[in-house]
Amino acid sequence: MREFNVSALLEGYRITDEVMAVSVQHAIKVMKSKYRNARNVYVFN
């Protein structure tokens, strides 16, 4: 497990959250499951 900085557009605001995940794709899925209405999700590192 690695820690990723994931950014998402949530209700018009850009938020950044640290997520523990196995891969970049998994980090995006975790972020989308955490915030159901998240859009434009991407990973910094």
PLM region spans:
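Short, mixed-charge low-complexity intrinsically disordered segments
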Residues: S33-N45
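Generic detection of short hydrophobic beta-strand segments and adjacent strand-loop junctions
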Residues: D17-V19
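Short aromatic-glycine-(Arg/Gly/Cys) micro-motifs in beta-strand/loop hairpins
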Residues: M1-I15
